[in-house]
Amino acid sequence: MDEQMNKKYLANKLFETQFALEDLREIVRQSLPTGMSNDQSEHYDEIVSGLGGLLEDLGKKNGQTQPVKIVGDLMCRTREEEFINIQPIQAGGRLTPEARKAVIAYGDGYSTCDNCRKPFRLDKIEKPSISTFHTDLAEFVGMDQARVVPGARRGFQAVASSIIEKGDTVVVSTFAHYTEFLAVEGAGGIVREAPVNEHNILTAESVAHKIDEVKRETGKLPALIMIDHFDYLFCNEHDIYGIGKVAQEYGIPFLYNGAYTVGIMPVNGQKIGADFVVGSGHKSMASAAPSGVLATTEEWADKIFRTTQMVGDVTGRKFGIKEVEFLGCTLMGAPLLSMMASFPHVKERTKHWDEEVKKSNYFINEFLRIEGNEVLSEFPRKHALSKVDTTGSFDKVAKTHKRKGYFFSDELKKRGIAGEFPGATRSWKMSTYGLSWDQIHYLSNSFIEIADKYDININ
């Protein structure tokens, strides 16, 4: 193991080098097709001559460095380079090298639109192969048609706006995300919550009971069922297949919220019994934000992806190819291209979900060796994201430590670990997703080291 490596130093030097290359790129952009001006050529040569020193610095792997500024007070983000990041909503959205390259190449505004031809719609563009990507996305989640959207929430919004009438009821879980509430409210609907059981699991029976309750009280069935496969509070797995059957039995459309599943584990919407599958690109598909996917069946495609029928009264203009719920096109640049660039890796990693769950359980088992530690999520774990409780261990230390709960953040940071909620020593969430086994072992040992340092018993 190369113990001479300084990750902060390397992160800063990498950014310095990348930014020098970007400065060269800007000179090339500003030059005429016939060549550079004398000033441009001189500046270009000056930057190139400095690259040798930067590469030499990178080769050292250690040394003195300063944080790298982008502009003004905007500094480089080096969390992923410097630390093992266990932040629960960032793990699945960590960009692949291919996605980072795509962001560099396609960061300019409407970069997807260089070759937009008739019929002038994002999902019809063939170069780059955005049209094919939409087909592949639908197949990836076991549905018939798909569209990219600016985050899962816009998928909820599109479905809610399409099928909910004012006063309609929508059944969600008591663990539903706030964006589901807002999507229903925006469409004029009313949320009714199906309660989880004593194990914080939503069952098919609970959903059926809530449907019956709504029917008795309103005389109508709910217009939609919208349920998370794994919730954001505990990341417990809910009876999504059973709920899919209930939806089919009652004839109610079912939206599967795959914000924490699509892109990290296998998902087949039609096998689940879903009419709509929504995923998050920036949460679980290694994509830049905002990005997501909405997929549906042929039965619902015409309604959800309906095109405008509006005609201008003076000009007679109409834009029939544009889809109403997406205001025409959705992701016109880096978010979409990052999603496309990561897609081969994302498809492959879903095949190894069992290994991610093994890593999660290995860490949690080691974590539970620390006396007073608890896991609040269902256990054994079925996901890489977990809610844990350290009230009986690290919070006891925090009560008398001069740094209070921040002592724990300090200890983790010293060991190159980030992403826990700063100052939290009671209940908090974390994710091991995407970590290597070496990182899992290091992470586990670090928690035990901290416990040992503060005389907390280790079993």
From Swiss-Prot:
It comes from the Archaea. Its cofactor is pyridoxal 5'-phosphate. GO terms for molecular function: Sep-tRNA:Cys-tRNA synthase activity. Converts O-phospho-L-seryl-tRNA(Cys) (Sep-tRNA(Cys)) to L-cysteinyl-tRNA(Cys) (Cys-tRNA(Cys)). It catalyses: O-phospho-L-seryl-tRNA(Cys) + hydrogen sulfide + H(+) = L-cysteinyl-tRNA(Cys) + phosphate. Keywords: Protein biosynthesis, Pyridoxal phosphate, Transferase. This is O-phospho-L-seryl-tRNA:Cys-tRNA synthase 1. The modification N6-(pyridoxal phosphate)lysine is found at K283. It is an enzyme of class 2 (transferase). GO terms for biological process: translation. It holds the Pfam family SepSecS. Pyridoxal 5'-phosphate binds at A152, R153, N257, S280, G281, H282. The keyword Protein biosynthesis applies. Belongs to the SepCysS family. It comes from Methanococcoides burtonii (strain DSM 6242 / NBRC 107633 / OCM 468 / ACE-M). Its EC number is 2.5.1.73. Homodimer. Interacts with SepRS.
